[in-house]
């Protein structure tokens, strides 16, 4: 019997406790076509994570360099007020476009990605902030094939 459930839900944990086998999830084949739109959409989640951290009330702009373009995330008093492309050259957050999807979706941590991808980097002591905004979390993508 295949359950097609996350390994983190209560029922799956029960089945595992009864001796069920865990299959590795199939590789993620996800592409975020517009990181700008995606980050706007998850803005309330990012704001909640800030509120529950030492970064409550954050006011600053984060520049994410995606090789061909940069995105600026403007936070004011802990609220994400603007996400848009910027032309300013910045090399503080180097976002490998392929690896960043794993960060945004919680599949890999910032440290995992910095280790695996030399062109994924977080400088100027922003690692902890990125960890708060994009923590590693269990997830499951249901696929229908």
What are these regions (language model features)?
Residues 1-145:
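Intrinsically disordered, low-complexity, positively biased terminal segments
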């Amino acid at each position: 019997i295949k359950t097609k459930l996350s390994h983190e839900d209560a029922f799956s944990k029960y089945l595992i406790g009864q001796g069920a086998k865990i299959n590795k999830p199939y590789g993620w084949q996800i592409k975020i076509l517009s990181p700008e739109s995606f980050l706007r959409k998850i803005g309330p989640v990012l704001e909640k994570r800030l509120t529950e951290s030492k970064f409550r009330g954050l006011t600053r702009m984060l520049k994410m360099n995606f090789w061909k373009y940069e995105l600026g995330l403007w936070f004011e008093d802990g609220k994400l007020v603007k996400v848009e492309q910027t032309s300013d050259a910045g090399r503080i957050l180097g976002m490998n476009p392929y690896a960043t999807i794993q960060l945004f979706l919680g599949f890999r941590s910032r440290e995992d990605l910095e280790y695996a991808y030399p062109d994924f980097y977080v400088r100027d002591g922003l690692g902890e902030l990125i960890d708060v905004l994009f923590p590693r979390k269990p997830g499951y993508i249901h696929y229908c094939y």
